Amino acid sequence: MWIKELELKHYRNYDQLLASFSSGLNVFIGNNAQGKTNFLEAIYFLSLTRSQRTRADKELIHFDHSTVSLTGKIQRISGTVDLEINLSDKGRVTKINALKQAKLSDYIGTMMVVLFAPEDLQLVKGAPSLRRKFIDIDLGQIKPVYLSELSHYNHVLKQRNSYLKSAQQIDAAFLAVLDEQLASYGARVMEHRIDFINALEKEANTHHQAISNGLESLSLSYQSSVVFDKKTNIYQQFLHQLEKNHQKDFFRKNTSVGPHRDDLAFYINGMNANFASQGQHRSLILSLKMAEVSLMKALTGDNPILLLDDVMSELDNTRQTKLLETVIKENVQTFITTTSLDHLSQLPEGIRIFHVTKGTVQIDSDIH
């Protein structure tokens, strides 16, 4: 899939903008604080109904307006789709082909994106919540039903934690009802995650071996707070551990086990990647991003859109080459932001150049 056209109204520093794109590489050049990242953020927001930079929708609204509108024309294998998101003080409205979508899971996945930004280099050593978010964003696009099950899980988790904080003593019967619901939704969330990580590991290892010239293997491990011996009995084991932890959870006023506490670990040649070099970290993250692209295509039959936000300068020529080879081979529409073309020595022919200045975007040329 690829985005043919994007229209922004009152989005950050873009008052009015209409732009059309190449189905291949699109490069946005401009000084810092001109709106390059805002532009990629808008594509990300149109895909996932959320910003990668802020949770406050009001920050997305142009300073002298009260509403935001984003519309995009998406070319999928199945045909052209029109997406629209409107933000106001009354909330947000999402539409597909002018039809309002009642559920997030009905909208997300229509336009898939993979974002590679400098912050992703913290994925290995950062907080576990970053890695859970990484899993959730990819899975939500590949399997929209996952978002529904995760939402149900989080709702019951909130109920259980609220009860634990307010109760003077344990009502075993009431807690048993919440435990059963939490274990049911949580088991399905974990099953989806495990399947995803197993599939991602195969793709990521293939890319990592290519980047390292066969010298390094990459493996991933889903680190669950629920102890289980096989995937088919997660529900029973989760339920048992919830019941076993009643007193501990009551004392701590929160739920001590479940997918909300799970993590993801990375290993290079069997060694924990926390101890890897900076170069190995870059290769690992690059391998993951390329694996996201190839896995989404394998599981959905369509390519995602790749957003590279000021990361090419973080990669040496070898890693740039590997990334762009994958983009060209997989025929992935790609958006690159940069302050200069000087360090983009490996750009292929056929790219479209845009200049970004103070919230305006001007097409430079198509290079053949």
From Swiss-Prot:
Its main location: cytoplasm. The keyword DNA-binding applies. One of its GO terms (cellular component) is cytoplasm. Pfam families: SMC_N (PF02463). The keyword DNA-binding applies. GO terms for biological process: DNA replication; DNA synthesis involved in DNA repair; double-strand break repair; SOS response. GO terms for molecular function: ATP binding; single-stranded DNA binding. Transmembrane segments: none annotated. ATP binds at residues 30-37. It comes from the Bacteria. It is found in: Cytoplasm. InterPro entries: DNA-binding_RecF, DNA-binding_RecF_CS, P-loop_NTPase, RecF/RecN/SMC_N, RecF_2. Keywords: ATP-binding, Cytoplasm, DNA damage, DNA repair, DNA replication, DNA-binding, Nucleotide-binding, SOS response. NCBIfam families: recf. PANTHER family: DNA REPLICATION AND REPAIR PROTEIN RECF. Belongs to the RecF family. The RecF protein is involved in DNA metabolism; it is required for DNA replication and normal SOS inducibility. RecF binds preferentially to single-stranded, linear DNA. It also seems to bind ATP. This is DNA replication and repair protein RecF. It comes from Streptococcus pyogenes serotype M3 (strain ATCC BAA-595 / MGAS315). The lineage of its organism: Bacteria, Bacillati, Bacillota, Bacilli, Lactobacillales.
